[in-house]
Amino acid sequence: MEAAFRYRMATRLARRLREAGRPLPLPALGEALGLRGPVERVVRPLLDGRFLLEEGVGLWEWRYPFPLEGEAVVVLDLETTGLAPGLDEVIEVGLLRLEGGRRLPFQSLVRPSRPPSPFVERLTGIPREALEEAPSLEEVLEKAYPLLADATLVIHNAAFDLGFLRPALEGLGYRLENPVVDSLRLARRGLPGLRRYGLDALSEVLELPRRTCHRALEDVERTLAVVHEVYYMLTSGRPRTLWE
């Protein structure tokens, strides 16, 4: 069975259990895949680390949360005018702090020194007029930085975003010393065998809603959805912090 298809079917089973809010027997899960009759040979191989097998099939996420109690996680994404730190600029910052069952979102457009290209406007859906009225990167980071305190950062393809973020924070006199988890690398561990590990490819495999444009907070939510699935695949009933 192709890896992408297997992960897609397993995620449908996890979604069915979340809808039910309780453990279900294998035949009921088979129905979620459109199967009838004996289904164990098909369903059981799909049950990865997310699933708890007792009386029926449940989910480990019902036993322990992500992130764990006492752990703070910040999922972060930047939108930029291009791929080259030092030449290109940040035009949007989005992040979501998760701690103690609370969600603290932050999003802001950023005014660049020169307008983005028409390609970037189409890609992000951010009109240059909106950027002209946005605060500077320094102003945005002064507001965002306190939300990073004592948190593990989760960033998809982290080296790219950090190439913009670290120099900007250092220019303000801040050092970014948080532990960083690259969700792209995490996905490679939890979802081996895929051809691509970009957010679009992972979202397709996990059947997340398609994005209409590249916006920071939308990509933060998609990254979080991917990491949530992969975290339980990898921990499989052995709770630990994301950084571990």
Language model segments and positions:
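Short amphipathic alpha-helical elements of helix-turn-helix/winged-helix folds
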Residues: R12-A20
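Short, glycine/acidic-enriched loop or turn micro-motifs at the edges of active sites
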Residues: T80-G82, R185, R222
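A short, structured active-site edge motif that brings together acidic residues
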Residues: N178-R188
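Acidic two-metal-ion nuclease catalytic site recognized across multiple nuclease folds
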Residues: E2-R8, R12, L24, W60-E61, ...
